[in-house]
């Protein structure tokens, strides 16, 4: 992962940003469709349904979007209030008081949030099953590790920090060992959540602790209120997340100043991320970066000899 070049990182983060952005059109505009399939298929279904936009839901989404963005222009102390938190609190309280039936919420779409921590599940002692799952488990562990380190690399670019890959993977592995004992599944570092954290000012490990404690409080105390969160508000927040991840100004600057090969690498990585798969995109981007270095390495070797 340390050999992934900046054009590759910008390409796949921009690609993920586009996927997130398009994936929220349904909730943002209140579209009465359920897009499925590959990205281009979902995009086509969504574009065809734009004649059925729900104006009321869209208005809620636009107000939420304004609440997310506005704190950036407020005076210093007020400006430190995270926009996503402000939008969530205001719009959730509004929905809880008004009870708009036409506005989809977490509760109406997915049901009530269970108000209890997961129970201990124990281990299965069927050793034949262990060997059967060994291959998939190794594959999931490898892919999860790659995704987490990619997420950490993106975080380093955004926050100007430097992560410790050994600590990251040790902590993730420890969590994934104990999570299944309580009915959980393998987790990784997520680029979207990481970008949201950093843009909201959370660039230290404390942000992860606050995230975990907040989830526990939501499950045990705030579940009835969380059920009133409008999906349009979540879509508005993810619109901003997608924009921040895409790093449009940085990408445009790269197009103007970078060598053509770097621009080509960015475009290929971006396209493969959106239309194929993240892992394929990163592998292709890294391969292109290495191929670009071969002539330089040969010339350097000849110079030294």
Where are these regions (language model features)?
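Transmembrane helical cores of multi-pass ion-transport proteins
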Residues: 1-304
């Amino acid at each position: 992962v340390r050999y992934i070049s900046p054009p590759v990182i910008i390409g796949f983060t921009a690609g993920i940003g586009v996927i997130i952005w398009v994936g929220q059109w349904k909730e943002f505009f209140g579209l009465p469709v359920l897009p499925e399939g590959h990205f281009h298929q979902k995009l086509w279904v969504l574009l065809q349904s734009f004649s059925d936009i729900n104006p009321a839901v869209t208005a809620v989404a636009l107000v939420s979007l304004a609440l997310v963005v506005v704190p950036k222009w407020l005076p210093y102390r007020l400006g430190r209030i995270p926009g996503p938190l402000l939008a969530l609190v205001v719009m959730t309280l509004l929905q809880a008081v008004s009870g708009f039936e036409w506005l989809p919420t977490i509760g109406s779409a997915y049901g009530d949030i269970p108000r209890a921590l997961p129970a201990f599940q124990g281990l299965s002692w069927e050793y034949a099953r262990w060997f059967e799952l060994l291959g998939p488990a190794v594959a999931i562990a490898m892919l999860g590790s790659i995704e987490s380190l990619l997420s950490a690399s993106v975080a380093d670019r955004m926050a100007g920090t430097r992560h410790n890959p050994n600590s990251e993977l040790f902590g993730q592995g420890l969590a994934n060992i104990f999570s299944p004992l309580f009915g959980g599944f393998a987790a990784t570092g997520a680029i979207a959540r990481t970008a949201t954290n950093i843009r909201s000012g959370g660039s230290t490990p404390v942000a992860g602790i606050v995230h975990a404690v907040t989830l526990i409080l939501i499950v045990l105390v705030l579940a009835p209120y969380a059920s009133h969160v409008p999906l349009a508000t979540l879509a508005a927040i993810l619109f901003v997340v997608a924009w921040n991840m895409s790093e449009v100004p940085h990408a445009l600057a790269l197009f103007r100043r970078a060598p053509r090969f770097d621009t080509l690498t960015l475009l290929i990585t971006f396209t493969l991320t959106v239309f194929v798969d993240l892992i394929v995109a990163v592998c292709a981007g890294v391969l292109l970066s290495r191929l670009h270095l071969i002539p330089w390495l040969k010339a350097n070797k000849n110079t030294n000899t």
